[in-house]
Regions:
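Outer-membrane beta-barrel translocator domains and adjoining extracellular loop/strand segments
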Residues: 85-90, 115-116, 145-152, 190-194
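Transmembrane beta-strands of outer-membrane beta-barrel pores
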Residues: 77-83, 105-109, 137-143, 172-174, ...
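N-terminal leader/presequence regions that precede the main folded/catalytic core
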Residues: 1-77
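Residues that define the transmembrane beta-barrel architecture of outer-membrane proteins
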Residues: 69, 93-99, 129, 158-164, ...
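Outer membrane beta-barrel transmembrane domains
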Residues: 125, 130-162
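Short loop/turn motifs that connect adjacent beta-strands in outer-membrane beta-barrel proteins
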Residues: 61-69, 109-131, 174-175
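Transmembrane beta-strands of outer-membrane beta-barrel proteins
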Residues: 69-75, 99, 129-137, 177-179, ...
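Predominantly the C-terminal beta-signal and adjacent terminal strand-loop region
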Residues: 173-211
Length: 211
C-alpha cells in the first residue's frame, strides 16, 4: 500500500462513500468520472443522460473507496521456480534465468480521507493498493542432467524452455511482485525424456514499476 499525492482524473467505481448517505445511495457501485480538487471530489455518473457533477467533501472521520480497473501489460522476471518431486528426484528449486510477458487485469483501490496538515489546514490523504491477475508467456533456462532425463552418461547443459501460466500480482508502487503457476516446454532433443516436460510448477514474479 502506498501514498498518492493526487488522484488522476478518470473513470472509477465508487465502492464506498462514507458520511454521505444520500449520495452513496445514488452513486454506490456506479461508474463515475472523478476529479480531485484539493479535499473535494467531483463525481460525474456515466449513466446519466445529462451528466450532473456531484461534490463529495473528504472528512477525517469518514472515507471514500474508489476502484479503477484496466488491462495491464508488463515484463517480469521469474527468479524462483519450485518443481514438485518426480521420478525419484526430490523437490527442485530453479533459480536460473526466466523472463515472461504478462497480460492481465489490474485493480487499483484508492482509499481517500482527510488529514490535518497543520492545526489550521486539512488536506486529502490518499492510499493506493494495486492487485492484478492474468496470464504470462516467456522464455527461460533449466539444468539438464542425467537425473532429469534418465539418460546415464548423457550431456549436461543449460536447456531453453518456453513457459506459460497464470499469475496474481501485488503492486508495491516501486515494484511489482506476484505468485505464478505454470508449465514448461523444453526445446531440444531431450524434450521427450525430460521428466518436467509439461509438468506444473509454482514460482515468484518480480518486476520494476516503470509506469
Amino acid at each position: 500500500m502506498g501514498r498518492v499525492s493526487q488522484l488522476e482524473d478518470g473513470w472509477y467505481r465508487a465502492m464506498h462513500l462514507g458520511g454521505a448517505d444520500s449520495l452513496a445511495r445514488q452513486l454506490s457501485r456506479q461508474e463515475l468520472y472523478v476529479q480531485q480538487h484539493a479535499d473535494t471530489l467531483l463525481l460525474i455518473p456515466r449513466s446519466a443522460p445529462t451528466p450532473r457533477a456531484r461534490r463529495y467533501q473528504l472528512r477525517p472521520d469518514h472515507h471514500a473507496l474508489l476502484l479503477n480497473r484496466r488491462f495491464d501489460l508488463d515484463v517480469f522476471t521469474i527468479p524462483v521456480k519450485v518443481r514438485p518431486a518426480r521420478a525419484g528426484v526430490p523437490v527442485q528449486l530453479n533459480t536460473t534465468f526466466n523472463a515472461a510477458v504478462y497480460l492481465g487485469r489490474r485493480l487499483d483501490f484508492y482509499y481517500l480521507s482527510q488529514q490535518a496538515v497543520t492545526p489550521w489546514h486539512r488536506a486529502a490523504r490518499i492510499r493506493a493498493t494495486g492487485l492484478g491477475y492474468g496470464a504470462f508467456l516467456g522464455l527461460g533456462s533449466t539444468a539438464i542432467t542425467a537425473d532429469v532425463t534418465g539418460r546415464a552418461g548423457g550431456p549436461e547443459y543449460e536447456g531453453f524452455v518456453l513457459h506459460a501460466g497464470a499469475a496474481t500480482l501485488y503492486d508495491a508502487r516501486s515494484f511489482n511482485v506476484g505468485l505464478a503457476a505454470g508449465l514448461d516446454h523444453l526445446l531440444g532433443p531431450d524434450r521427450r525424456v525430460w521428466i518436467y516436460q509439461h509438468r506444473p510448477w509454482v514460482g515468484i514474479l518480480f518486476g520494476l514499476d516503470l509506469n
